[in-house]
Amino acid sequence: MPGSRRVRPRLRALLLLPPLLLLRGGHASDLTVAVVLPLTNTSYPWSWARVGPAVELALARVKARPDLLPGWTVRMVLGSSENAAGVCSDTAAPLAAVDLKWEHSPAVFLGPGCVYSAAPVGRFTAHWRVPLLTAGAPALGIGVKDEYALTTRTGPSHVKLGDFVTALHRRLGWEHQALVLYADRLGDDRPCFFIVEGLYMRVRERLNITVNHQEFVEGDPDHYPKLLRAVRRKGRVIYICSSPDAFRNLMLLALNAGLTGEDYVFFHLDVFGQSLKSAQGLVPQKPWERGDGQDRSARQAFQAAKIITYKEPDNPEYLEFLKQLKLLADKKFNFTVEDGLKNIIPASFHDGLLLYVQAVTETLAQGGTVTDGENITQRMWNRSFQGVTGYLKIDRNGDRDTDFSLWDMDPETGAFRVVLNYNGTSQELMAVSEHKLYWPLGYPPPDVPKCGFDNEDPACNQDHFSTLEVLALVGSLSLISFLIVSFFIYRKMQLEKELVSELWRVRWEDLQPSSLERHLRSAGSRLTLSGRGSNYGSLLTTEGQFQVFAKTAYYKGNLVAVKRVNRKRIELTRKVLFELKHMRDVQNEHLTRFVGACTDPPNICILTEYCPRGSLQDILENESITLDWMFRYSLTNDIVKGMLFLHNGAICSHGNLKSSNCVVDGRFVLKITDYGLESFRDPEPEQGHTLFAKKLWTAPELLRMASPPARGSQAGDVYSFGIILQEIALRSGVFYVEGLDLSPKEIIERVTRGEQPPFRPSMDLQSHLEELGQLMQRCWAEDPQERPPFQQIRLALRKFNKENSSNILDNLLSRMEQYANNLEELVEERTQAYLEEKRKAEALLYQILPHSVAEQLKRGETVQAEAFDSVTIYFSDIVGFTALSAESTPMQVVTLLNDLYTCFDAVIDNFDVYKVETIGDAYMVVSGLPVRNGQLHAREVARMALALLDAVRSFRIRHRPQEQLRLRIGIHTGPVCAGVVGLKMPRYCLFGDTVNTASRMESNGEALKIHLSSETKAVLEEFDGFELELRGDVEMKGKGKVRTYWLLGERGCSTRG
């Protein structure tokens, strides 16, 4: 590459040392690895803090595999490739290598990684016949095996970058020319120089194309214009090696110079992905983003940019290796390894050392020795190896095949993502399926312009034409000229016809005077919005909100505004006719429509669209009208839109813009009036106070003129808009100056004098945005050239008020739509809440009353009392509960009953029963109602009683865990009557002698036993499965002697009474 300097060692004399004198130290079974890397500066990808953990992981794998170097011990010795300043040195590295060779006689050298350090060490090792392994030293010159005969590079090399670029050019059809730009800093390891060198030499060799190169200094701004000139003259496909910030600056300058992605493509040679790096490693990033105010332009510029990096392995072995590398680096080297492409280097050192050990093992197996460096090296070359970085292929020259990735920007998100991967072994480009290369025109730009860089293509500069071509050209030009002339003649005839037709003329007799009050009432009756209860009521009502000084009349049934002109007569000159035509041509939503003009003396007047809401000045001065900033921005935007149309049309400027000439129609759209028709302006304006009051909006340069132009100037309109803007912001009147009570004449005199600083209205920054105040100041600047045009004002207002960009009514309707949507969401939310509460209420009702009874009540039906022929009733209580309660606190009693009944409730859910009530320690359950179940009620209650008795035996009292709870149960079968009693806290109650008998059965029972009546026993015998025992005749109150039984259990169950 032109301009490159060869890497030469300064210690050439050391090569003269006899190899035999250096073979000292070590033992027969030791294999010594000499490491020559930066030991303190961790910024290098091959620093010892990064590579050391990888080497230890590799040696641990060697030790764990008995087939590798059996009987040998690998030991490491370290030497630094840094000088005193902590940077790689072509002096320190060879000195360290000589010291290590003399003292330890190593079998292999690991490193260096820096090019200028590796060059002399590589020559030394070739002379000593000792292999050198490195994952650095990627320069093209290290691959010259005449000098570096035993150097093996297991990491990326720049000559492989040239192979990738060659494949890229072939795929995209770039076969002629490329341009390479690189930032070079003398004094360091010159990474960009060596990156570009490999690309430059390989692409020229493989493609036989022209590759121009240009060096620059990042910190010197004078270099950048030269680079852009070089790009214009020599390149459309440009490769740039620099820091991410320098590349971004170049892209911004290229955008400003018009070097866009339609004709140019810029490749950033960022092999370690520094511009894409984040805390999470390589993820979709925005390398154009800095937050400095230029991000929007930078994003646009980066549409022409692509980024080339090494391809990061994604195989599971590499991911696991990274985890172990980070842990070991933090634990033993006190260094934090971050995610990123730099981790490829320590991983490559790891794989290289394993490859070397494999080669040594094979050499020893063939009868060789560890000092046979040439044989070992040849075993590593032209070989494939599966390492943590994946499939590793060392070519015939001892260089690893390197994979690369091409990153491109997603035009929608602005994030860069991988679109192409390059396989260094197969030399194939593989597209990423979900991503595609983005080209602004849909295809890549050519590497040479269509007509060449200097327009030298003869096809673009034909000086001679054939006779047929000349005739065709002359004929075409003649036809085009004829059509153009015909068009202008037709247009002129139409114009003259329109001027003569006087479509604008209105006869005074056709005007019918109107009653403003009558019109206001009719307009009010047609309003569809009511102001009552609205924040905007003062704008939506018809009382007192109109321009009461506007003269109106009916013309052809339509109400129009009539402006009398204080002139005796109007000469209809050609100039006046053109003014009237231009007024008829104006069609804009924010300019009042010109209806016509009456030129019949003495009734000379102008007719325009009537806007019933009055002028902007009326609205601002009416304190009963509430204007929030949404309304104010809408009014301001309407003025800007109207003035933008006016300035870009035939009328050019207004000349009399003020708040009283801005009117609001029935749809709350602000329109500008009193524009154009300068020939109709009053020749003798008012005198005194009125004259000066009307000039408060006039620009100072116009005030200083003896005869200012009737149509004013565009800069003067901007000044007037600035005054109106202050009126809208403060609502304190025109040209309000805080603390001063000046007459209009005094204000005009001070503005005209041109004081320093210029005399202008006050700005209360508390009442509006600071940016809006700055816009006012720019609009009323003393120098007309410093005032922004309305196009810029429109853009500025959009930034201030992004949410409300349309007129008042549209914004109002939008807000009402939001309210409706919010109301729908609220109704849905409340409906769901209601349904949830309804579900809870029904669940509670089902717990208080039987399900069938609760359904009747929900349907609004009356629950009638009902007689049941046969049901079974269960009663139980706790023996000794009164004494237990006396010895316990009230809270302990409540806790006991809650625990017990919670247990009981869980048990009875498994049976066809209904819990009637609990009173104290009494528990009442029934089966057979309200839903009849035949004779099954006795069986269900019997089984339930057995289950409860079984549950109570294992029940533990919290405050008396050693005490057994003694449950007493009584059961009886018979007829009952049941119904709902009460309106408040209704209860489902049972009535009849069966209830009393069941209660007697319980009170006459015994603890931990189930007492049955003979009626229940008779029903249970139908099921032939229960074990019963005769108790005998028992004396019961009100019953006499009654024969009763004990329920012992059910056959097939383990429960016993």
Curated annotation (Swiss-Prot):
GO terms classed as biological process: blood vessel diameter maintenance; cell surface receptor signaling pathway; cGMP biosynthetic process; cGMP-mediated signaling; dopamine metabolic process; intracellular signal transduction; negative regulation of smooth muscle cell proliferation; positive regulation of cGMP-mediated signaling
Residues recorded with modification Phosphoserine: S515, S525, S530, S534, S538
MF (Gene Ontology): ATP binding; GTP binding; guanylate cyclase activity; hormone binding; natriuretic peptide receptor activity; peptide hormone binding; peptide receptor activity; protein kinase activity
Membrane-spanning ranges: 470-490
Catalytic reaction(s) noted: GTP = 3',5'-cyclic GMP + diphosphate
Domain Guanylate cyclase residue range list: 872-1002
Phosphoprotein in keyword set: yes
Phosphothreonine sites (modified residues): T528, T541
Signal peptide bounds: 1-28
Glycosylated residues, chain numbering: N41, N208, N334, N375, N382, N423
Extracellular compartment segments: 29-469
PTM field: Phosphorylation of the protein kinase-like domain is required for full activation by ANP.
Domain spans labelled Protein kinase: 524-801
Keywords, alphabetical: cGMP biosynthesis, Chloride, Disulfide bond, Glycoprotein, GTP-binding, Lyase, Membrane, Nucleotide-binding, Phosphoprotein, Receptor, Signal, Transmembrane, Transmembrane helix, Vasoactive
Result for mutant: S534A: Reduced phosphorylation, 50% loss of ANP-dependent activity
Bridged cysteine pairs (disulfide): C88-C114, C192-C241, C451-C460
Effect of T542A: No effect on phosphorylation, 30% loss of ANP-dependent activity
Function comment: Receptor for the atrial natriuretic peptide NPPA/ANP and the brain natriuretic peptide NPPB/BNP which are potent vasoactive hormones playing a key role in cardiovascular homeostasis. Plays an essential role in the regulation of endothelial cell senescence and vascular aging. Upon activation by ANP or BNP, stimulates the production of cyclic guanosine monophosphate (cGMP) that promotes vascular tone and volume homeostasis by activation of protein kinase cGMP-dependent 1/PRKG1 and subsequently PRKAA1, thereby controlling blood pressure and maintaining cardiovascular homeostasis.
Protein family membership: Belongs to the adenylyl cyclase class-4/guanylyl cyclase family.
Protein name (record): Atrial natriuretic peptide receptor 1
Species whose genome carries this gene: Rattus norvegicus
